[in-house]
Amino acid sequence: MPRVKRGVQARARHKKILKQAKGYYGARSRVYRVAFQAVTKAGQYAYRDRRTKKRQFRQLWIARINAASRQNGLSYSRFINGLKKASIEIDRKILADIAVFDKAAFSVLVEKAKAAL
């Protein structure tokens, strides 16, 4: 069998990893072995945090809605329950946005939720 030389593939693979590691500090951006570990770990963090981001934003929206609804004399859980009973279907992202930027409209929603309870 003829000898197989893999220099071209190895160079391409190394270049790909070093390109991904561009901007990293020190050896992480220059040495293939270290860069490979750094890129792999960065990928793991990115995968994990794409899922964590969804949870964190939901927590943030709930905290904002809770604060705004308590200013109007209703706890978060009772407010959400009232909205469901009043058959008002607005998701938490939009509710949080209304709570921050349009306090008058949020007060109207709280009153409707109170009436439905």
Curated annotation (Swiss-Prot):
GO biological process: ribosomal large subunit assembly; translation
GO MF: rRNA binding; structural constituent of ribosome
Keywords on record: Ribonucleoprotein, Ribosomal protein, RNA-binding, rRNA-binding
UniProt superkingdom: Bacteria
One Pfam family of this chain: Ribosomal_L20
Entries under InterPro entries matching the protein: Ribosomal_bL20, RIBOSOMAL_L20_CS, Ribosomal_protein_bL20_C
SUPFAM superfamilies: Ribosomal protein L20
Matching PROSITE patterns: RIBOSOMAL_L20
UniProt GO cellular component terms: ribonucleoprotein complex; ribosome
NCBIfam families: rplT_bact
Function, as annotated: Binds directly to 23S ribosomal RNA and is necessary for the in vitro assembly process of the 50S ribosomal subunit. It is not involved in the protein synthesizing functions of that subunit.
Family membership noted in the UniProt record: Belongs to the bacterial ribosomal protein bL20 family.
HAMAP family with a match to the protein in the record: Ribosomal_bL20
Protein name: Large ribosomal subunit protein bL20
Organism, scientific name: Vibrio metschnikovii
